[in-house]
From Swiss-Prot:
This is Shikimate kinase. Keywords: Amino-acid biosynthesis, Aromatic amino acid biosynthesis, ATP-binding, Cytoplasm, Kinase, Magnesium, Metal-binding, Nucleotide-binding, Transferase. Its main location: cytoplasm. The gene is aroK. NCBIfam families: PRK05057.1. Mg(2+) binds at residue 17. Pathway: Metabolic intermediate biosynthesis; chorismate biosynthesis; chorismate from D-erythrose 4-phosphate and phosphoenolpyruvate: step 5/7. Its EC number is 2.7.1.71.
């Protein structure tokens, strides 16, 4: 049994919510998505929060939610793509669980997010270029906070989740060896 919280970080479209839900189901943990928690508590969507409060207002809400959620036990938490921008979030995540960075190349992120209108940072003339810029800015922060880095791509959710679990099980009874990098090979049958 995995007796620690699992926190997923990575860019928008990397699969944090989808993989997080699956991980929670197969580990018996409770699943939380920090963005959905913010929407649930405010009663409005992330784009509306960005429109009214700007990104800085949203980030303040995000810090409060993450500080609260990391206090829970037996959870899988999918964070927002920009959660790592705040040093306090990185500190809280590192101290309260195992952090898994789900990495995907920008073109893959673009394919996954291109039809999603709920991403205010991609409301630009060139969303692919914006994704590249965001990843360039945030990748060092994801890597700083990560205990494990899993490169995703076109792999099925089950294959990625199973690789995350395989890596996490190595930590049973002890602290992880930080910065393991794993590339999950595509497995069509998984």
């Amino acid at each position: 049994m995995l007796n620690f919280n699992i926190f997923l970080v990575g860019p928008m479209g990397s699969g944090k919510t989808t993989i997080g839900r699956y991980l929670a189901r197969i580990t018996g943990k409770n699943f939380y998505d920090s963005d959905r928690e913010i929407e649930s508590r405010t009663g409005v969507s992330i784009p509306v929060i960005f429109e009214i409060e700007g990104e800085s207002g949203f980030r303040q809400r995000e810090c409060k939610i993450i500080a609260e959620l990391v206090q829970l036990n037996n959870i899988v938490l999918a964070t927002g793509g920009g959660a790592v921008l705040a040093a306090e979030n990185r500190r809280e995540l590192s101290q309260r669980g195992i952090v898994v960075y789900l990495y995907a190349p920008p073109k893959q992120l673009y394919r996954r997010t291109s039809h999603d209108n709920n991403r205010p940072l991609l409301r630009t003339g060139n969303p692919l270029e914006r994704l590249k810029c965001l990843l360039k800015e945030r990748d060092p922060l994801y890597r700083e906070v990560a205990d494990v880095i899993i490169k995703t791509g076109k792999q099925p959710v089950k294959a990625v989740a199973n690789e995350v679990l395989r890596q996490l099980r190595q930590y049973k009874g002890g602290a992880p060896q930080r910065k393991s990098f794993v590339h999950v090979k595509s497995n069509k049958g998984a």
